[in-house]
Amino acid sequence: VMLWILIGSIFFGGVHDFGALYSSIRFDGKTIGQIIDATLGKSGKFLFSIFAYVTLLVVIAAFANIVAATFVASPQAATASLLFIVLAVIFGFSVYRCGLSLGVGTVIGVIMLVVAIAIGNMYPLHLSKNVWVCILMVYIFVASIAPVWILLQPRDYLNSFLLYACIAFALLGIAIYQPSMQLPAFTTFDPSGKGTNPMFPMLFVTVACGAISGFHSLVSSGTTSKQLDSEGNAKLIGYGSMLLEGVLAVVAVVAVGYVGGDKLTELLKNGGPVNVFADGVGTFMTKLGFSFGVAKGFVALTISAFAMTTLDTATRLGRFIFQELFTKVDPKTGEAQGNVLTNPFVATLITVVLSGYMSLGSYLTIWPIFGAANQLLAALSLLAVGVWLKSVGRDNLMVLIPMAFMFCVTLVALAQI
């Protein structure tokens, strides 16, 4: 797993994310689906869009459950997360409409983040999982149709400081704590012992975001490319961010490996994967002077905050793809012709209702194929980038190699599933 994360994030995920972002910039901020239309044709775009939309619905449903479960297990994180939303709106208005400088706004915003965390610890919000799922569905509907500058962008920006702090604390804690792994480093290439789902190819479709994830291509081309100040920032944002995610994935492996055994099963049952990660990293942070309760709550808050950004971003992307699917182009003028289904409110409502229904449990039916579907998105995105690079006379070997590998592992995985 560790080798796949290290090799994958550098030679696969980084190339994939940067390639999708850079090609979108060169296509005037168009989505990866529109790039596929230009490089592989309308049929290719249609199939990709259907595939991507269903995948996004599963992402929204799954992450809604993950965030809701985290809020139930860590109610203080729920309070702080709601306060973050209010803080993001105030930050967006202050910077973009009232002329507050970014530097001053950042200092005030980070201080208010700490205040929100403190308030969350004092006033934890206890609600059931189903109630939280309903609240999250309302939130993502509003967030996905609101202008990017008022919520999505400031919220992600302020949340990034939580992530930087969490990674820094985790790495320092690991260095001082020097944890020993409670799980065996290797058992067999067929852990189940049944001849099914062996390490190859299942490892490469199970460990995704820390190595390579097709979802990233949708984000890079759907929202990120439209927010860059200059093309020169694409490498740091597209490639660099993937490397940072690789670091976070390494921390996750260490945390899970340290927890291990029976405690791992118990934590998974009472709070899910976020609970396991928070418990492990929270333990490491005790070496930095934090109490275990405060440290675990902080880590749970950080992860739930980023899971919520995934929720609203995935909903916005789902709306984009839904609108593209039902937008017709006038063959004479080449202009897009909208209809009721391409209305932002209608497209968002349909996306939220479908994912909300799936979050009640039906998404679990197709969840086993999600990993392979996500990685197949990555392979298709790399194919589109590779074809585009070839069409403009640029070398595309660094894209074709990871593309071929991802096609191989995903198709074998789908055949086994």
How does the language model describe each region?
Residues 5-9, 51, 62-82, 100-105, ...:
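Transmembrane helix-loop boundary segments of multi-pass membrane transporters
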Residues 129-146, 172-179, 189-231, 235-240, ...:
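Hydrophobic, membrane-embedded alpha-helices of multi-pass small-molecule transporters
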Residues 174-189, 243-279:
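Extracellular/periplasmic helix-exit of transmembrane alpha-helices
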